[in-house]
Regions:
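Hydrolase catalytic cores
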Residues: 210-213, 221-222, 234-242, 271-281, ...
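Edge beta-strands of jelly-roll/beta-sandwich modules across compartments, strongly enriched
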Residues: 423, 447-460
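Short acidic, glycine-rich surface-loop motifs adjacent to enzyme active sites
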Residues: 71-72, 238, 267-295, 318-319, ...
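Catalytic cores of secreted or luminal carbohydrate-active enzymes
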Residues: 282-283, 300-340, 601-609
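Extracellular S/T/G-rich loop segment that most often corresponds to the catalytic His/Ser-adjacent loop
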Residues: 143-152, 156, 161, 165-176, ...
């Protein structure tokens, strides 16, 4: 059954759904008639992979969109190349964040006894930056979801798990060290580390995050240093999203994209190390999406919050790179919303969104969210002037529009009441959009006074060429799942001049909860964690995911003080967040909390200073 299930989980012929109710509610007593696999995430949430030929209609929009997996992209700037740059490590961001100050003999916070956990593109485990002084690995395990030839972790159905013992054996083989400690070149010419542990990080993003948060200290910190350089490491290399999901979300070729189903299973696996090793675990998520409600109402966000709320778990999530992308629109219908002088309600007020589409865009999605009892209707005007009258889509159905003079096809789907939040969603899927300015009119058929709606376009990584609102709103531009309530959500700033990173995602959440929580450095960071070879090569990188890694490293230092050293053994993400808020650096001329900085800049040293007051 496990092998059979493995094929279903990885095959593009099986469509995945995220369920937050028992499987029996779908199949009843007829489950045996269906070709499917089911993975239990927790007591409420499960993942169904079902043969697409057994669905009544394989057009995805005919099914419940809210059960589709989210698709997430990496929150970095640029891709790593094979070029070796060999720059000099700059400790300034660590000092600015109060990280190196607590590594001294008085507190000696180095991440000792803490597990740093990552779900990302993998790790270059052969790099010296992830080894102890004796050459052994600091990695407790790697679950590579992309390798199907080995055994998956216990209780999981796909991928291959590599233990610390296997990784050490691979490293010893590559260095020519035999089991008895002698060294030779004979007998190892045809055996490499990758023959034993064939897990690599082709992208480099995951390797950089781990190195930044917990890479080994070199040269007593002068050659390289990280916040939690003595923490243990667990990594999940996520498998790429299935092709049907990429096609549905219209992800460009060559762009990394991952399904929330695999991220949830990764987090479940990483969480198990807290139980097995009885140690605190710090999770770092450096990816996100613009889809979903920007409130944490979906099953994915709810699951992450359930993990973040456990004792000895600390969840850190990036706020994303969408703050300056012009991908968010906020509209508000005027007070009265179409009422005439006599109070009649014949015509609803319409708010027009203008979306610019560049040449070379094959397609994109746009989501429009509002609160009940607003009943959204949309009109469409093409760049060529063709017009579709305001139409209210029926509950969980879709309308498909074609045009006379333009080749664009638009499908409009309505979830009148969505799962989780209960809010209303209109999803618009553009195929082969005509370049130019599209005008989308939005009105409320129920004419709720002073009603508001929000619309989002995909993250920049998921667009071939620019697509953006001409009158955007920069707020509420953090990527999902940054809105998870108990997680520590990071804004990104430049620690060299204390300015906010221009692309840093902004809050608050759509329901006005305070997010982001704390800003961390993420601009021009020198990181030793190249994806190739054994020797660390220091290079400079920028991006919101790096701010999350810096915060995760600091959280691991704090977890050592709290849990390992016994000062607050039952601590959770929310309490760690509050400690960090108390110690955050704040400017006198700025009001806090705010949508850009949250509660201020990370200052781990000042967190402990505040405890003494």
């Amino acid at each position: 059954m496990a092998q059979d299930c493995r094929e279903k989980i990885i095959s593009n012929n099986y469509i995945d759904f995220v369920l937050d109710f028992p499987l029996e509610e779908i199949f009843g007593d007829e489950g045996g008639r269906y070709d499917y696999c089911y993975q239990q995430v927790d007591s409420r949430i499960g993942i169904l992979s079902i043969n697409r030929n057994q669905l009544p209609d394989t057009s995805l929009l005919s099914n419940d969109y809210m059960s589709f997996p989210d698709i997430l992209g990496l929150q970095q700037v640029g891709e790593e190349t094979n070029e070796v740059r060999g720059e000099v490590f700059n400790p300034s961001p660590l000092i600015q964040s109060g990280i190196t100050q607590v590594q001294d003999a008085r507190l000696n916070l180095t991440g000792r006894g803490v597990i740093l956990a990552f779900a990302d593109t993998g790790i270059n485990y052969r790099n010296r930056i992830f080894r102890n002084a004796d050459g052994s690995t600091r990695i407790l395990a790697i679950w590579d979801q992309t390798v199907q030839e080995g055994e998956p972790p216990e209780g999981f159905l796909y991928g291959t798990e590599y233990t610390k013992e296997e990784i050490d054996r691979a490293l010893q083989t590559e260095s020519g060290i035999i089991g008895n400690g002698s060294t030779t070149t004979a007998g190892i010419q045809n055996v490499r580390a990758l023959d034993i542990v064939p897990s690599i990080d082709e992208n480099g993003h995951g390797t950089r995050l781990v190195s930044l948060a917990g890479g080994s200290r070199l040269g007593e910190g002068s050659v390289y240093n990280s916040p939690a350089f003595q923490a243990d490491i667990v990594v999940v290399k996520l498998k790429p999203a299935k092709e049907y999901l990429r096609e549905y979300y219209q992800i460009p070729d060559g762009v990394s994209a991952y399904s929330s189903t695999d991220v949830m299973m990764a987090v479940k696996y990483l969480d198990s190390f807290a139980k097995v090793f009885r140690r605190p675990v710090v999770f770092c998520l450096g990816m996100g999406t613009n889809f979903r409600d920007h409130e944490s109402g979906g099953a994915f966000s709810r699951y992450l919050n359930s993990i973040a709320s456990k004792r000895s778990r600390i969840m850190v999530i990036t706020g994303g790179n969408e703050g300056n992308a012009s991908h968010h629109y906020r509209g508000r219908f005027p007070e009265g919303n179409g009422r005439g002088e006599n109070g009649d309600r014949n015509v609803a007020s319409e708010e027009s969104m203008e979306v610019y589409v560049s040449e070379g865009v094959d397609g994109f999605l746009m989501e429009v969210w509002t609160e009940a009892p607003v009943n959204l209707a949309v009109s469409i005007r093409t760049p060529g002037g063709e017009y579709i009258d305001p139409t209210s889509v029926l509950f969980q159905t879709n309308l498909r529009y074609r045009f006379v003079f333009e080749e664009t096809v638009i499908t409009v789907y309505n979830a009148y009441i969505t799962q989780g939040s209960g809010d209303a969603l209109v999803l618009m899927r553009f195929e082969n959009p005509t370049p130019g300015i599209w005008t989308i009119g939005v009105s409320d058929e129920n004419r709720v006074a002073d009603a508001r709606f929000d619309a989002w376009l995909p993250i920049s990584e998921f667009l071939q060429q620019p697509v953006y609102f001409l009158r955007p709103n920069p707020d509420t531009t953090m990527t999902t799942p940054a809105y998870v309530p108990d997680a520590i959500t990071t804004a990104t700033y430049n620690s060299f001049d204390n300015s906010i990173y221009q692309e840093s995602g902004r809050g608050f959440s759509r329901d006005e909860r305070i997010k982001p929580d704390i800003a961390a450095p993420g601009v021009d960071l020198t990181i030793a964690g190249n994806r190739l070879g054994e020797e660390p090569v220091i290079s400079t990188y920028t991006g919101a995911s790096l701010a999350a890694a810096m915060m995760a490293g600091a959280a691991a230092q704090f977890a050592q003080w709290a849990v390992v050293d016994g000062n607050a053994p039952y601590i959770r993400s929310q309490e760690v967040k509050n400690y960090f808020i108390r110690g955050a650096s704040r400017d006198r001329n700025i009001d806090y909390p705010n949508e850009i900085w949250g509660w201020g800049r990370l200052d781990l040293y000042n967190t402990f200073v505040e405890m003494e007051r």
